[in-house]
Each structure stands twice: as structure tokens, then as C-alpha cells.
Amino acid sequence: MITIKKGLDLPINGKPEQVIRDGNAVTEVALLGEEYVGMRPSMKIHEGDTVKKGQILFEDKKNPGVVFTAPVSGTVTAINRGAKRVLQSVVIRVEGNDQETFAKYSPAELVSLSSEQVRQNLQTSGLWTALRTRPLSKIPAVDAVPSSIFVNAMDTNPLCADPAVIINEYQADFTNGLTVLTRLHNKVNLCKAAGSNIASVDNVDSHEFAGVHPAGLVGTHIHFIDPVGINKSVWHINYQDVIAIGKLFTTGELFTDRVVALAGPQVKNPRLVRTNIGANLSQLTANELADGNNRVISGSVLYGAKAEGAHDYLGRYALQVSVIAEDTEKEFFGWISPQANKYSITRTVLGHFGRKLFNFTTAENGGHRAMVPIGSYERVMPLDILPTLLLRDLEVGDTDSAQALGALELDEEDLALCTFVCPGKADYGSFLRQALDKIEKEG
């Protein structure tokens, strides 16, 4: 077992009840194009087309063979594009139950599948997009081979769902999905919380992690088990997509249900809800939120995406919907007050003392300023890197030094705590993505 001591469990109010219930019915779902790093779509449909569940919507021009399929059947009502015609979202109005079918096998046949059979079924169904690489966090090429595959069956994000609750509901499908992954590659790592009753299968290496966030992030697991570099990559996948793989191979149908934690200080009844990948979040959260101006976030409060307009949908990789209040009011002499209801990792406010939960908002509690190295980053960074030096290089754009300091091991989520505790209010996730894009392009 690996215990993580450096990090932070955010003391935020609104933790979800760990019981799965059906969420509000949604009439719209969407695929969000900007979630897929470096993807350039070749559209296969147009607005007004009727599509089946599992039908190809677009293909990646840069990665031929990687297709993105419809999560529901219905009518394409909008193809939203942003600056430079970047694909923002493909919106589908839910209608009917028509769906494409794919190869299916009995559970006993799964252990004898070839790697080619697994690749073919994942790629034609669109479930290949559930896999992502480290470094770069991109969808792997159809013929790529990783050093290993990581299955993340734990979560330590603020307000997260307990993966064991969801896996227990789909235990057979999860087991079948793991078996399929062992046929894709002979080195599969299952990472779970210490003491978890999540069962493994033959030919899968189980690893237990304990401690504070980011103990549940796949970047932490990769760092301690099979570190990556410029010439070495691994793939990773979350536990709900493993369930979907198990369903696909035993039923021949695409499974796009998603159980998410609907939680946060502004949620009336925080709980786990069953919905669909790409669900419209305005519809999913209707009558669920406290009065006032709220920010709905697809994903974690630490690094999720604001859900509004063309992006008002549940992300492909999001396992939670977080809601906090929009804070637009300025506090008079806020810096000089005792601030008993505010939290700070630096212990400079009264709110730090005592084990209480806080109603966090969108307030940054300060303006953007120069980087201030006072040891905050080191307190929340458990990986064997020098965070202050790395973050400095990312902020100034020195990719050579950042690469030498371990930037290739990281994703935006791995630096979310550094952003949270930063006295200078810098967004290190965006700096990291700019650096990774430059490293990929220029080396």
C-alpha cells in the first residue's frame, strides 16, 4: 500500500449521500469537442440528421480510425463552433431507442479474445476514446502500444462518489471489462482505495493507495508504479468506462449511462444520480439548486469546466457535477477581518481552526500577482518533483526546464491543488497545457 501524506482534502460543504438514484430526465445530450486534446474533427453528420446510438458523429483527422459515436439516438440539433471554427459541441435531441450493434461474446469467451478483436470492437463502437495517454492526455493512436494500462477505481476529489458503491452495482460488468483489458495488453494495473472490497481478476495487478487528495488521481498512481517520459507512455481509464467495456463485449450494445455525484454547497439534496454521458446539466440540475446565482461545474470544483452555453453538458470523463455560488460582491476591508467563515491553508484566518466545512464560492479572495514561494506548493505536492521550480518554468514558458523537472508526467488535474493554494492566483493547469502542446510540437 502507498500512503500519500502531502496534499489536501478540501473541507467543502455539500458532500453527497452515497446512494444511487435516478436523476432528472434530460432531452438533450452532447459531445464536447474541446475535451479531446489535439483532436481535429472530420464531421460525418450535419444539423438535422437523425442518428442512432453508437453511430459515428465525427472522426479525428489527426488520428485516423479514432471515431466518436452518438451516446443516444435522436436528431442533431446543433453543431457549435468557437473561434477558428474549433468544435465546441454536437448536440442531440433524445428521440427513440435505435442503436447500432457491435460484436458480442459470452463471458467465457472473453479470456480467449485477441488484441486485434478487442481493438476492433473498441474502435468501431467509439469506446476507444475512453482511453487516454500519459504523457499528453490524448486518445491513443489505433496501433499504439503502451507500457501498461491503469484502471482508476478510486477517487479523492472533493464531493466525489465512492467508486465501490457504483462498481458493486455493476460487479459482473466491471469484471468482464477488466478481462477485456487484459486481452488488450498484458500489463494492467488496478488502483483502488486501501481496504476496498473491489475485486480484481487474473492477470491484473492490484495496488492500494491511502491518504489525502491527490491519492486518488491517476497521475499519482502512474508516478509511483510506472512513471512515464518522453519515450515511454501508459494508458489510463476510469472505472465506469471499464463497466461500459464489459457491457459492450457481452451485449454488443453501447452503454452510456453515467453515475455522477451531484453535490456542493448549493445543492439541496447532494447524492449520486444516474444520467447519461453528455447530459444537459441545466436539465439535470433543474429544481435541485439553492436560490441565487450558481456556478454549475462539470467535474471537480478544483479543475472542472464551467457548464454554460455550448458547454452546458456533462463531460465525457466527468464523474461529478459540482455546484458553488457565484461570488461577485467585494468585501469591505476583507483582508483585515478575522474571517471565521473562510478557509486558508496558510492558517492566516480564524476559519482554519476547528474541523468545520465551508461554503466555498467562486471568489478568488485576491487579485493576480507575482508568484510567491512560501512553501504552499510543497505542502500539497506528493510527487517526487520540485513544484516551485516547475511552476515557475511553466509560468514563464521554459519548456526545456519544465520537461526536465517532470512536466510530462502531469495533467491539469495534478496541478489543481497548486492553483488552489497559490497566493498569486495563477492557473497552473493552463500553463501546463500550453507547455505540453509546445513540447509535442517542438520537442
Curated annotation (Swiss-Prot):
EC number: 7.2.1.1
Pfam hit, one: NQRA_2nd
Entry superkingdom: Bacteria
Single GO MF annotation: oxidoreductase activity, acting on NAD(P)H, quinone or similar compound as acceptor
Presence of keyword GTP-binding: no
Keyword tags: Ion transport, NAD, Sodium, Sodium transport, Translocase, Transport, Ubiquinone
Enzyme category, top tier: translocase
UniProt catalytic activity: a ubiquinone + n Na(+)(in) + NADH + H(+) = a ubiquinol + n Na(+)(out) + NAD(+)
InterPro entries for the chain: NqrA, NQRA_2nd, NqrA_C_domain, NQRA_N
Swiss-Prot/TrEMBL GO biological process terms: sodium ion transport
Ion transport listed as a keyword: yes
Record's function text: NQR complex catalyzes the reduction of ubiquinone-1 to ubiquinol by two successive reactions, coupled with the transport of Na(+) ions from the cytoplasm to the periplasm. NqrA to NqrE are probably involved in the second step, the conversion of ubisemiquinone to ubiquinol.
Assembly, per entry: Composed of six subunits; NqrA, NqrB, NqrC, NqrD, NqrE and NqrF.
Family: Belongs to the NqrA family.
NCBIfam families listed in its UniProt record: nqrA (TIGR01936), PRK05352.1-2 (NF003759)
Classification via PANTHER family: NA(+)-TRANSLOCATING NADH-QUINONE REDUCTASE SUBUNIT A (PTHR37839:SF1)
Protein name (record): Na(+)-translocating NADH-quinone reductase subunit A
Organism encoding this protein: Mannheimia succiniciproducens (strain KCTC 0769BP / MBEL55E)
Taxonomic path: Bacteria, Pseudomonadati, Pseudomonadota, Gammaproteobacteria, Pasteurellales
